[in-house]
Amino acid sequence: MAQPTFFQSPPPMTLAAIAAKAKAELADVSQGDKVIKGLAALDEAGPMHLAFFDNLKYADQLARTNAGACLVSPRFEARVPGHVVVVRANQPFRAFVQLAREFHADALRPQPWFGDDGISPQAIIDPTARLEDGVIVEPLAVIGAHVEIGAGTIVGAGAVIGPHVKVGRDCNVGARTVIQCSLIGNDVLIHPGCSIGQDGYGFIFFGANGHTKVPQTGRVIIQNHVEVGAGTTIDRGSLRDTVIGEGTKIDNQVQIGHNVTIGRHCLLAAQIGLAGSLTIGDNVALGAKVGINNHLTIGDGAQVTAMSGVKDDIPPNGRWGGFFAKPTKQWFREIVAVERLVRDQTATSRDEGRE
């Protein structure tokens, strides 16, 4: 069976042209006419591929690679095998990504699955909805009353957009995504299977008649250039809005509770859980599976390591980790101290056993 390809193949290109595009230089300019037909990882590259190397963890792969050429920094240039053309770059990975973005522009954002012919006859669209020219609505999508959708937006198969929702221009609403009570800016990519704008988790707990539901009357506001990973859930606010700031990138399967405010250009890795009424500043990075308690403030530029549990405010530019999270230097010192204590106790027990 032929190997399936999901993205367009780049055109063949000489190494001289590639070096110019990547703002790199050939160690041997006589190799400038050599033709490259694609990009590949070191361990999968063939003679017609360009690879990159910038991490000594992959030194063995570099030594065995069959790549025709390799982007590499001057400090690692001597490690490149003789049969591989050296393409010298100060930041090889950035240069590689720059080339990949040009060669595979169709992979930068989700494309229509069922063609680009506008509105599918299998879609259901309320007559009061307003769709600008160039909107694509795929089969079995449902668009409710008074919805507004901007030009260039794709609504994926089986997606549901509830009444009065506003979606900006050049957005992607992934297949089987559900959006309600939300205002969404321009150039927002929402991957398949997301739920946005549903009730927040608000109750008065353990009353005389059990748990009393608190009305959730806020909205979700997603600003421009945000990306929301597959399976992510974003609850609407109870009184104030849940806000996702401009340029923030959210990984798959993240839970964002009601009333949360996330600043601009934040990074949230997979399976994070954010409890309600958090305030997260700009340029914050949260590792995978971080959990943060409610009503906290995470300062601008803070970073939290993966699988940490946060129960206290974090100051701007703080580097925290652990369970419960604390400044990473303190956390590492405590880990070392505990390991030393266990080691000493083990040694003492052995000595006592000999007696």
Curated annotation (Swiss-Prot):
Alphabetized Pfam families for the sequence: Hexapep, Hexapep_2, LpxD
One GO term of the biological process aspect: lipid A biosynthetic process
Protein keywords: Acyltransferase, Lipid A biosynthesis, Lipid biosynthesis, Lipid metabolism, Repeat, Transferase
SUPFAM superfamilies: Trimeric LpxA-like enzymes
InterPro entries with a match to the protein in the record: Hexapep, Hexapep_transf_CS, LpxD, Trimer_LpxA-like_sf, UDP_GlcNAc_AcTrfase_non-rep
Superkingdom, natural source: Bacteria
PROSITE patterns recorded: HEXAPEP_TRANSFERASES
Reactions accelerated catalytically: a UDP-3-O-[(3R)-3-hydroxyacyl]-alpha-D-glucosamine + a (3R)-hydroxyacyl-[ACP] = a UDP-2-N,3-O-bis[(3R)-3-hydroxyacyl]-alpha-D-glucosamine + holo-[ACP] + H(+)
Transmembrane segments: none
Biological pathway: Bacterial outer membrane biogenesis; LPS lipid A biosynthesis
EC class of the enzyme, as a word: transferase
Record EC number: 2.3.1.191
GO cellular component: membrane
Catalytic residues, chain numbering: 258 (proton acceptor)
Function: Catalyzes the N-acylation of UDP-3-O-acylglucosamine using 3-hydroxyacyl-ACP as the acyl donor. Is involved in the biosynthesis of lipid A, a phosphorylated glycolipid that anchors the lipopolysaccharide to the outer membrane of the cell.
Family from the record: Belongs to the transferase hexapeptide repeat family. LpxD subfamily.
Oligomeric and partner information: Homotrimer.
Protein name: UDP-3-O-acylglucosamine N-acyltransferase
Organism, scientific name: Bradyrhizobium sp. (strain ORS 278)
Species classification: Bacteria, Pseudomonadati, Pseudomonadota, Alphaproteobacteria, Hyphomicrobiales
Gene name for this UniProt entry: lpxD
